[in-house]
């Protein structure tokens, strides 16, 4: 054993046992020098290095993006005072910076509505803390997208359609490998992302008030129809939306045979509804499969509605907020911002505006009174694009000189903004001509059959959606298909406007029908 310990350490080289002597200091120094040289070489920027963002000609990613932006025509400024009688919703002066059509996403909870919007627009609509924690949409989400078509005749459909964010240049290069063409902007769409949860039905109805068309999401891995699928379809039927595209989502989780069977159940479900004959597009929103086909159907099957730019402008408020950071200096404070969709007319920078009903209070006798808010428009925005004027379509942020405390946390939601002195009357009670659904939608009873809708009864409390206003209403009197409702809070509306009616069933508001306003008691605003 001791003899073995005394032996010099050795290794086998070419079959011979060779002794291992002391390490050669010179060789080690050479190795260290060689490693140092290799490290230094690695630190030198190569022709294309991912972490520095350098391209072969020394151009950074940011510089490349700027160059492509300029080559694609950039994003031209809007003219200050254009002739609105000569403009239409697809005019370059408008469509380059602002969406001109509102498309809603509707369907049952967790069927992929927000994911589809993100796949098309690249914008995450789920933003709030509560929404991110639960992974559901709670408030209405908004995202704008530009849809382009390649002008190269050899570029095949639907590959030639591509969507980008709303700040994209007007004529980018085609992204299909080997295609020399450039894209042309054909649509600028604003998506209204509605919540699918049953308890958020009133939020969905507020969103339906501004929709021009809808994408109905139906998940392929669940039976059709789910409760809110039918409830949302009834809601857009009430709003008389004629243009619907059905997206059969999550096809990546199914076999071909089951996808075809599921499609048959969709066709059976939509028979006789407003969506009868609508295209059914199989997609995977997560994998962005068939999204180019969705873009093609949006362009080909959903026309941009005609807009009248010459009449008095009106906007319904769907969001409002205070943009000031806590602790901001007094001279840096900005006025409140109202976000909403313009129904008709054109708003311009500097316009005098009126917000109705405004500040609602009660006098000494407990009688409701309204004080409209007057202000000026100081800024107009469509997402990140600043505007000189704004037309109907898309969500517009209107910067005002209004006290920001009146706007924070959606306090202006349901109000109507318009030119001073040109807004409709404020009503405290209304007389309606109503129509009830035959069966209750979105509720599964014990026998899996839908319950019948009861007739309206005096003194019962309903929820009515007038535009983006959701307010309580007590039934004062009922006769045949006419009823008189006393509103909990006053609403700025017009005769012959369509409203949605909901009743509280099992602690949730459920859609039971719709109505048309025939007349009502107006409230004179205080000066």
Curated annotation (Swiss-Prot):
Note: Present with 20800 molecules/cell in log phase SD medium.
Region (G5), start-end ranges: 284-286
Outcome of swapping residue 509 to A: Disrupts binding to CDC123
Positions of the UniProt region annotated as Disordered: 1-83
Any one Gene Ontology cellular component term annotated for this protein: eukaryotic 48S preinitiation complex
Keyword Cytoplasm: yes
Impact noted for substituting residue 281 to K: Impairs eIF2 complex formation by impairing binding to SUI3 but not SUI2. Reduces cell population growth
Family: Belongs to the TRAFAC class translation factor GTPase superfamily. Classic translation factor GTPase family. EIF2G subfamily.
Primary subcellular site in the record, as a coarse category: cytoplasm
Outcome of swapping residue 281 to R: Abolishes binding to SUI3 but not to SUI2 or CDC123. Abolishes interactions with the eIF2B complex subunits GCD6 and GCD7
Alphabetized InterPro entries for the sequence: EFTu-like_2, eIF2G, eIF2g_C, eIF2g_dom_2, eIF2g_GTP-bd, P-loop_NTPase, T_Tr_GTP-bd_dom, Transl_B-barrel_sf
Region annotation (G2) ranges: 135-139
CDD domains associated with the record: eIF2_gamma, eIF2_gamma_II, eIF2_gamma_III
One GO MF term attached to the UniProt entry: translation initiation factor binding
Subcellular location: Cytoplasm, Cytosol
GO biological process, one term: translational initiation
Span list, region Interacts with CDC123: 515-527
Residue numbers spanned by region G3: 193-196
Annotated positions binding GTP: 110-115, 249-252, 284-286
Effect of residue 218 to A: No effect on cell population growth
Protein name, per record: Eukaryotic translation initiation factor 2 subunit gamma
Annotated positions of the Phosphothreonine modification: 60
Record has Thylakoid as a keyword: no
């Amino acid at each position: 054993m001791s003899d073995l310990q005394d032996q010099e350490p050795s290794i086998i080289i070419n079959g011979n046992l060779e002794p291992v002597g002391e390490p050669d200091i010179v060789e080690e120094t050479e190795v260290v020098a060689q490693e140092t040289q290799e490290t230094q070489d690695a630190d030198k920027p190569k022709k294309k290095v991912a972490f520095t963002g350098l391209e072969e000609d020394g151009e950074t990613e940011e510089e490349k993006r700027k160059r492509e932006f300029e080559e694609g025509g950039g994003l031209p400024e809007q003219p200050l005072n254009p002739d609105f009688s000569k403009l239409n919703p697809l005019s370059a002066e408008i469509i380059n910076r602002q969406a001109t059509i509102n498309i809603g996403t509707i369907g049952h909870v967790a069927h992929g509505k927000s994911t589809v919007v993100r796949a098309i627009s690249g914008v995450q609509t789920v933003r709030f803390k509560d929404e991110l924690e639960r992974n559901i949409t709670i408030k209405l989400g908004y995202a704008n997208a530009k849809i382009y078509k390649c002008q190269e005749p050899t570029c095949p459909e639907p590959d030639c359609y591509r969507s980008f964010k709303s700040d994209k240049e007007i004529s980018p290069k085609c992204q299909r490998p080997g295609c020399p063409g450039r894209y042309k902007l054909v649509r600028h769409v604003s998506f209204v992302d509605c919540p699918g949860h049953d308890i958020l039905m009133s939020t969905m109805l507020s969103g339906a008030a501004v929709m021009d068309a809808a994408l109905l999401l139906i998940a392929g891995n669940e039976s059709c129809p789910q409760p809110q699928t039918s409830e949302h379809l009834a809601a857009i039927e009430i709003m008389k939306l004629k243009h619907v595209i059905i997206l059969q989502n999550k096809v990546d989780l199914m076999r071909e045979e089951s996808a075809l069977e599921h499609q048959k159940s969709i066709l059976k479900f939509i028979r006789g509804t407003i969506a009868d004959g609508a295209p059914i597009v199989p997609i995977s929103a997560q994998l962005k499969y068939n999204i180019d086909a969705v873009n093609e159907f949006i362009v080909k099957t959903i026309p941009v509605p005609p807009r009248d730019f010459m009449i008095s402008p009106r906007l319904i408020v769907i969001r409002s907020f205070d943009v000031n950071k806590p602790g901001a200096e007094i001279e840096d404070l900005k006025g409140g911002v109202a976000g909403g969709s313009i129904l008709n007319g054109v708003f311009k920078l500097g316009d005098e505006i009126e917000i109705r009903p405004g500040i609602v209070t009660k006098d000494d006798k407990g009688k409701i009174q309204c004080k409209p808010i007057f202000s000026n428009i100081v800024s107009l925005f469509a997402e990140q694009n600043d505007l000189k004027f704004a037309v109907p379509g898309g969500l517009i942020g209107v910067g005002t000189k209004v006290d920001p405390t009146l706007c924070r946390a959606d306090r202006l939601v349901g109000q109507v903004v318009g030119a001073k002195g040109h807004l409709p009357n404020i009503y405290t009670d209304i007389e309606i001509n109503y129509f009830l659904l035959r069966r209750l939608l979105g509720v599964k009873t014990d026998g899996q059959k839908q319950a019948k809708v009861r007739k309206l009864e005096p003194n019962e409390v309903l929820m009515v959606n007038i535009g983006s206003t959701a307010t309580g209403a007590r039934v004062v009197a009922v006769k045949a298909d006419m009823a008189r409702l006393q509103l909990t809070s006053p609403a700025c509306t017009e005769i012959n406007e369509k409203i949605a009616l909901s009743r509280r069933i099992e602690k949730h508001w459920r859609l039971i029908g719709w109505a048309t306003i025939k007349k009502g008691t107006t409230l004179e605003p205080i000066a």
